[in-house]
């Protein structure tokens, strides 16, 4: 259940933020929130997170569907007490679903978080995916260590 709740919350927050950006900005508009550090900048991204692989929507739609299918499968395999793994998969699934929605209905992904310290603009869904993948890597490393100790 935690996976579904997390997916729903991530998707809803992502959707609300994107609708607010689309309704209040024109593409390319940038508003400084913290000058020279953080701006809200509305861009339509034809690629992956952080503008990588532009124009490859045909790769990302099936990839997101496969990720979501894998998470549905995992829902039934992960013990209930492994709540952190369930939360992690919910973050990844919610982010994947948020960007999949954009690709299917807009043709590009709405990005708006613009930290001036690097040239990438991203969104809440991207952040959820990155945090989820980071947590997944940590959990996998911890599990590997645990298995090595029992051998």
From Swiss-Prot:
Lineage, highest ranks first: Bacteria, Bacillati, Bacillota, Clostridia, Eubacteriales
PROSITE patterns: SPASE_II
Record has Hydrolase as a keyword: yes
UniProt pathway: Protein modification; lipoprotein biosynthesis (signal peptide cleavage)
Record's subcellular location: Cell membrane
Family the UniProt entry places it in: Belongs to the peptidase A8 family.
Source organism of the structure: Desulfitobacterium hafniense (strain Y51)
BP term (GO), one: proteolysis
Catalytic activity: Release of signal peptides from bacterial membrane prolipoproteins. Hydrolyzes -Xaa-Yaa-Zaa-|-(S,diacylglyceryl)Cys-, in which Xaa is hydrophobic (preferably Leu), and Yaa (Ala or Ser) and Zaa (Gly or Ala) have small, neutral side chains
Name of this chain's protein: Lipoprotein signal peptidase
Any one of the GO CC terms: plasma membrane
